[in-house]
């Protein structure tokens, strides 16, 4: 499963939050740990993945244990479905066991051990480790090591499940193909190496996982209602196939489909369908932006049963130090992303030639050219009104040719609308020297230039058009 972020797995400094129980919740500010890179030795024997695929060595490129799990389990499941009647009790237990094993991954392997998003008492650790073993996705240490590398090197060749290599590679390919340990990005797992329970799980994972994934569901269904075979095929094998591919969807779908409301510097996305099948891991863009937050979303209606489970566990004292990212920083991310979207939209629109790119025209030249061209001067900017049809009549427009119409345009005759100012900007052709001097705008000297968007373009908001005068000039009253 992936939990993406360019900031990668991070240790964190914490601050008490005013939200909820301060003794249980902490705000975290991630700090990327300093982890030395592996040094590549060009004289070292080539890994199989550094050698071309041939008819003689193709089998050496594959991870056969993973191949048996990924391809063998679905075939066993299909055989079981066609040869074993499904009992209602077994179906109910299989669904519950699916949720339990999924929770072992999401609340345990992922948020507890990979990201240290909260701390857990030993009973909760044992409970989650057993559920994670039932998912048969590797030991706590192995899973967390790859996941931390994924966060640190998201979307690069050092990312173990790099989605840039395609959907199928991110989904299952990275497990089918034997990984080159010299090419996978390094991650810091010293905290896991010093945890006796995690290392016990790592050393004895295969027998523990075999029991939890296959033997326990068979015994449970068999001893309670005599359905050993159904317990094995449905609560064991079929459940495991669904758990695996639900988890794999976080590596693949959650990096390809969905929204990016918090950060778009990497491929992580929020995807509701993935959240449904993974107990809340589908809010992946949030997770990659704020990886040490025990939540995968802010709002109550964002589907994240893992968050609810952790919170309830904290009420019973089984979980504590629940990390939450400062809300102010989360809101900043939202605003910045929305600004990016607006900037991309703005970049598609015609805002007229930027003032600094306009030529400088002498006032005498403006007067001379106005004899043959429909030029209008407003606030020091020359506009060529060729082809424009004035809604108030062409007579009003012609009366402004060759003149400074600043006052008339800004309330002297009519206080033109925001749309009129925007439209006028598309007709500008020069700025004048003399008269209303605005050459200074071209260099910015002595003037406060408008803010720029992320594309480097000036942001022109309502009422900030260069042709608008504040406050508008009052029209002359009739005597």
UniProtKB/Swiss-Prot annotation:
One Gene Ontology term, aspect cellular component: cortical endoplasmic reticulum
Pfam family, one: Cyt-b5
Cofactors named for this entry: Fe(2+)
Keyword annotations: Electron transport, Fatty acid biosynthesis, Fatty acid metabolism, Heme, Iron, Lipid biosynthesis, Lipid metabolism, Membrane, Metal-binding, Oxidoreductase, Transmembrane, Transmembrane helix, Transport
Binding residues for Fe cation 2: 150, 255, 284, 288
Cytoplasmic side: 1-61, 111-204, 251-479
Positions of the UniProt region annotated as Disordered: 1-28
SMART domains, per the entry: Cyt-b5
Motif stretch (Histidine box-2): 147-151
UniProt remark on cofactor binding: Expected to bind 2 Fe(2+) ions per subunit.
Cytochrome b5 heme-binding domain span: 357-433
GO BP, one annotated term: unsaturated fatty acid biosynthetic process
Low complexity compositional bias, start-end: 1-18
Entries under InterPro entries matching the protein: Acyl-CoA_deSatase_haem/ster-bd, Acyl-CoA_DS, Cyt_B5-like_heme/steroid-bd, Cyt_B5-like_heme/steroid_sf, FA_desaturase_dom, FADS-1_CS
Residues that bind heme: 390, 416
Keyword Transport: yes
Binding-site residues for Fe cation 1, renumbered to this chain: 110, 115, 147, 151, 287
Major localisation: membrane
Membrane topology: Multi-pass membrane protein
GO molecular function: iron ion binding; stearoyl-CoA 9-desaturase activity
UniProt motif Histidine box-1: location: 110-115
Similarity comment text for this entry: Belongs to the fatty acid desaturase type 1 family.
Functional description taken from the UniProt entry: Stearoyl-CoA desaturase that utilizes O(2) and electrons from reduced cytochrome b5 to introduce the first double bond into saturated fatty acyl-CoA substrates. Catalyzes the insertion of a cis double bond at the delta-9 position into fatty acyl-CoA substrates including palmitoyl-CoA and stearoyl-CoA. Contributes to the biosynthesis of membrane phospholipids, cholesterol esters and triglycerides.
Record remark on domains: The histidine box domains are involved in binding the catalytic metal ions.
Protein name, UniProt field: Probable acyl-CoA desaturase
Organism of origin: Schizosaccharomyces pombe (strain 972 / ATCC 24843)
